[in-house]
């Protein structure tokens, strides 16, 4: 999946990779950021993705062709990252927000995934992400987000 020319929805994590760092990375790869947020994944109610972010993602999926959109995650742990990926592709599993029962089919990638990382300017990645890559469980996060994408993403 090539980032260049895509419209990126950025869902950063206060305890992982924040929105501004993700924005810098995807912009360096040629994507247009259409929405960026930093939330506290572990703070959200009942493990659900932030309600306002769900609303914005839904609006963007209605505004742009879904095949032009990509969601880039910065979650600090696998479960929260997987939950966000599932919400934007298959609907809110907590049935708590605007995406409850709404299957957008959007592709979500974590910034750590090799197919995303290799498209980012190495200097930008080093400055914005590499420190967190050293302290988080990259393998578990990548595996979880990839499995959700392979199961639910349609575009």
UniProtKB/Swiss-Prot annotation:
Keyword RNA-binding carried by entry: no
Reactions that this protein is recorded to catalyse: acetyl phosphate + [thioredoxin]-disulfide + NH4(+) + H2O = [thioredoxin]-dithiol + glycine + phosphate + H(+); acetyl phosphate + methylamine + [thioredoxin]-disulfide + H2O = sarcosine + [thioredoxin]-dithiol + phosphate + H(+); acetyl phosphate + trimethylamine + [thioredoxin]-disulfide + H2O = glycine betaine + [thioredoxin]-dithiol + phosphate + H(+)
Keyword Oxidoreductase listed: yes
Keywords: Oxidoreductase, Selenocysteine
Active site feature: 43
Single annotated GO MF: betaine reductase activity
EC number annotated for this UniProt entry: 1.21.4.2, 1.21.4.3, 1.21.4.4
EC top class named in words: oxidoreductase
Disulfide bonds listed in the record: none
GO CC, any one term: glycine reductase complex
Function recorded in the entry: In the first step of glycine, betaine and sarcosine reductases, the substrate is bound to component PB via a Schiff base intermediate. Then the PB-activated substrate is nucleophilically attacked by the selenol anion of component PA to transform it to a carboxymethylated selenoether and the respective amine. By action of component PC, acetyl phosphate is formed, leaving component PA in its oxidized state. Finally component PA becomes reduced by the thioredoxin system to start a new catalytic cycle of reductive deamination.
Family (UniProt): Belongs to the GrdA family.
Self-association and partners: Monomer. Component of the glycine, sarcosine and betaine reductase complexes, together with components B and C.
Protein name: Glycine/sarcosine/betaine reductase complex component A
Organism field: Symbiobacterium thermophilum (strain DSM 24528 / JCM 14929 / IAM 14863 / T)
The gene coding this protein: grdA
